[in-house]
Structures are given as structure tokens and as C-alpha cells.
Amino acid sequence: MMTLEPNQEQLKKMKSHPGFIAALDQSGGSTPGALADYGIEPNTYSGDDQMFALVHQMRTRIMTSPGFTGDRILAAILFEDTMNREVDGEPTANYLWQNKQIVPILKVDKGLAQEKDGSQLMKPIPQLDSLLMKAKKKGIFGTKMRSFIKHANPAGIEAIVDQQFELAQQIIAAGLVPIIEPEVDIHCSEKAQAEALLKQAMLKHLNQLPKGQWVMLKLTLPEQDNLYSNCIEHANVLRVVALSGGYSQAEANERLSRNHGVIASFSRALTEGLTAQQTDAEFNTMLDESIEKIYQASIT
């Protein structure tokens, strides 16, 4: 089978343009919380259809906001439901790239399995191949998949990294660039040890990748500044991006600015303070200020 290639124009932007990634990919499980933060309480809507319609309105408001452009934002991570919908009458991925010069990325995982060896692997993704084909047709550049590390257990961390890189091969073959996201719990009591084990396991896999195969890494901001510099410099790594992981926007930005070459891929820290009740002017101003702060922290 011929391996498909990623979109070269988007690859070039992801590789060399300053900026960060907006994570707009809360899925079924985290949507009620995201809506509540936005000022829409669960008792004001009923059923998944209404919930997803409301969250799409919220995301549309973000994506169409004047400050939300490719000047400071490299890419946006979308939930599958968002990819299947439209923004301003255009399919979401097209809208982002054609109108905003923002690279579209799709969250592909189906959530986390039960904890084993101090980690949570991803649940199986049975229809991954057909989802990747659909994403490629819709103009998606890359994917994102998250697993979760709670303790510094070598067996658990190795299992997480093995699974991530195995699925990454399937994604690369479909002509997409995978974001590998082995999140380390910010409340982990042995966080620094877990991060050292994670780095070791990732470098082992990265060193086995053939020339020209790209991956991105999405990681918790580490206890030791610049811990992941070897990963940033690795020939197969397009970008190393950081999740906010429950840190406030101020703390996430502060930690990010100390990690040179790492850029943000924030979700909660990006939308902090935005509400449905704000006027468009208030909403756009607050979003623009958040984008600027995260952008500045990303270019250090």
C-alpha cells in the first residue's frame, strides 16, 4: 500500500511559523463541564443533540472571532462532531484553513481505559482506518490521541508509549501527522520521575522512526524546565506542544515561557473567562487578550 503524504503547505506552516495550537476538542464526556464554564448550565438543555449544537455555537463564536487567525494560531484541534459540522456555511476544516490559515487537526481517541500499572491506556479505536480516510478527504492535517499517566510506574508508562506509537504508524500511513499525547497528571506525587521515564520511552520509539515520518508530541509542562529539549530537536518531531492540564492560564503560560521551543496547545486555559452572556465585543476582546498571552509564552 502506498503511504499518503501530509498537506505540504500545512506541514511547512506547522514546522516553521510562530504560534500555538488551540484545543477545541472537548468530547462527549467533557462537554457539560466546558458549557458550564461558558455559562450554560446542564438544566438549560436536554439530550446530546442540544448539547453538541450549543457547544458548536460556542466553538463557532471562537473560530469566527477576529483575533482567532493563523497569525498567532498554527492549528486547531477538533472533536469529530465539529469536523462534521459547518462554520459560516463551510465545512469546519475548510473554513479554518481557507479563511483563517489555521491547520485543522482531529481528536481520534475514544477516551481512556481503566487504570493499570498507574496509567490509563486509550480504549480501542475500532473504526480508526475509516475515520482517518474521512478526515483526509475533509482536509484534516493531523490527529490527536490522549492517554494518561498517574504514577511513575515504568511498566505503565512503557505500555502507554508503545500504544501511542503503534497507532501513530497507522495514522502516518493514512497521510496524517499524529499528535502523541501521553499526559502526566499534574497532581502526580512523583511527577518528575514519571516525566523522566516518559522521555526515555519516547526517545526510544522516536529513534526507531524512519526518516521523513513526522510526529508531534503533546506533553504536560514538566517539573524540570527544558526536559524535552532532545525531543524538540529530534529529526522526526514536527513540534512539541504543551497541554495546560488543569493549571490556570497564568501558571500554564509562566511554565510554558520557561520551556524554550515548546508551544501551547491549551483548551481550558484558552477559553478561561469566556461566557455566553458576554457581548461580542467583550468576548472578542477577552479571547484576543488570551490568544496574545498564550502566543507570547509560546514564542519564548
UniProtKB/Swiss-Prot annotation:
Under Gene Ontology molecular function, one entry of this record is: fructose-bisphosphate aldolase activity
Quote any Pfam family the record assigns: Glycolytic
Gene3D superfamilies recorded: Aldolase class I
Q: Which reaction(s) are listed as its catalytic activity?
A: beta-D-fructose 1,6-bisphosphate = D-glyceraldehyde 3-phosphate + dihydroxyacetone phosphate
Instruction: Please list every transmembrane segment annotated in the UniProt record, as residue ranges.
Output: none
Instruction: Name the pathway it acts in.
Output: Carbohydrate degradation; glycolysis; D-glyceraldehyde 3-phosphate and glycerone phosphate from D-glucose: step 4/4
The positions flagged as active site in the entry are: E181, K218
Query: InterPro entries under this entry?
Result: Aldolase_TIM (IPR013785), FBA_I (IPR000741), FBA_I_Gram+-type (IPR023014)
Q: Which GO biological-process labels does this protein carry?
A: glycolytic process
Which keywords accompany this UniProt record? Glycolysis, Lyase, Schiff base
EC id: 4.1.2.13
Similarity field: Belongs to the class I fructose-bisphosphate aldolase family.
What is the protein's given name? Fructose-bisphosphate aldolase class 1
Instruction: Please name the gene that encodes this protein.
Output: fda
